[in-house]
Amino acid sequence: MVEKNKEYIFDIISQGYEGEGIAKIDNKYPIFIEGALKGEKVKVRIVKVNKNFAYGKLMEVLEASEERVNPPCAIYKRCGGCKLQHASYKAQLDFKWDRVKDCVSKIGKLDPSIVKYPLGMENPWRYRNKVQLPIGLINGEVKIGFFAPRSHDIIDMESCLIQDEIGDKVVKLTREWIEKFNIRPYNVDGEYDEKGIVRHIMIRRGFTTNEVMVVLVTNGEKLPHKEEFVDLMVKNIPGIKSVIQNINSKKTNVILGLESKTLWGEDTISDYIGDFRFNISPLSFFQVNPIQTEVLYGKALEYANLTGNEEVFDAYCGTGTITLFLSQKAKKVYGVEIIPQAIDNAWINAKENKVENVEFFVGESEVVIPDLINKGVKADVVVVDPPRKGCDKKLLDAITNIDAKKIVYVSCDPSTLGRDLKVLEENGYKTLEVQPVDMFPNTAHIENVALLIKK
């Protein structure tokens, strides 16, 4: 065992699911050390001790991995945004590959050789088309940035290397406006001030269209000097198309409220994924890395291997982005989603893109899909793109009961993917391949697409 606040020297033998280094005592008791890489010898101070594991703080790298690099971000060690900037991009992809293989083999009980090497980015920086940052007044100074890990302390940010560069400029201008007109933030020294006005700033940009939306989230309708804010954005932000005030007066960690007022320009901006154009409002869901989204959806379409004669189900279809991709090669695609507003947007997206061979349904996929089967729809291919918690067990049961010929599983969590693949394998399906896609470079997150066929 180890003792809290004492320092030890460890060899890092592996990495955890969040990218942290792992050392072991007697090959049993794990120590988790953020910032350490596999193969390194490190000096560590123990900060937390539990019965089955401990956490350590990296004090010094005694023998560095060849894959260690100097993080280019000035606030990397304090910010909670990225976890892997200290690793080369190759090492990041290797880690994510190992993680997916580990989940597929240990949780899914499958041969890890079915997991292909991750599809990475040519440039793993500046890939996010959306940034949302809290605004605070800390010790009398205006802070706009990210929360520190496991806290509400705002780490002031001048530039974020994974966000679009236009966001840096908007943040600078917003800070200048707050300071010039003495606009009081809602977050004051880590506490919520009911008299505070500004809560967050959000920037969205269409990478293909170059259209920019700036959203200022306020604690109520009151917004003094809003004309000056609008003027500052319109005169200084290239591609600006929309300046919006979003009102969120609730005591909550949820960033956006339900009411938005357009202060200048349009209510939405637009962007493309492949050949499809999508309208984006402040509250719209839209993948934050459009470059890799096209790669992800392209792989899903490749796995579906449609000839134009198939009827396809798209479960958890959201606003219909994957549905539209599938429509290019399918006879008909049926999208199912439990959130009514998402289905409203899906119909709008289909209409905007003149796609007619799709139909959308509000409801639980495990109820809607069997009902459509009973009405004569064929289950040639089922595509699922569930949230992080994975597929509902009832949906997996429904898929196996309707005897779908092929399943394409799009996943944002390797652990729940492994769990669900195991269930499907036990119920008549065979997993042919899993393809990781790196949607979030410099973080520990990894997306996957899996192909299953009926045995």
From Swiss-Prot:
GO terms for biological process: rRNA base methylation. Pfam families: TRAM, tRNA_U5-meth_tr. [4Fe-4S] cluster binds at residues 73, 79, 82, 160. The active site is at 412 (nucleophile). It comes from the Bacteria. Its EC number is 2.1.1.-. S-adenosyl-L-methionine binds at residues 287, 316, 337, 385. CDD domains: AdoMet_MTases. It is an enzyme of class 2 (transferase). Belongs to the class I-like SAM-binding methyltransferase superfamily. RNA M5U methyltransferase family. The keyword Methyltransferase applies. InterPro entries: MeTrfase_TrmA_AS, NA-bd_OB-fold, SAM-dependent_MTases_sf, TRAM_dom, U5_MeTrfase_fam. This is Uncharacterized RNA methyltransferase CPE0367. Keywords: 4Fe-4S, Iron, Iron-sulfur, Metal-binding, Methyltransferase, S-adenosyl-L-methionine, Transferase. The keyword DNA damage does not apply. Residues 1-60 form the TRAM domain. GO terms for molecular function: 4 iron, 4 sulfur cluster binding; metal ion binding; rRNA (uridine-C5-)-methyltransferase activity. The lineage of its organism: Bacteria, Bacillati, Bacillota, Clostridia, Eubacteriales.
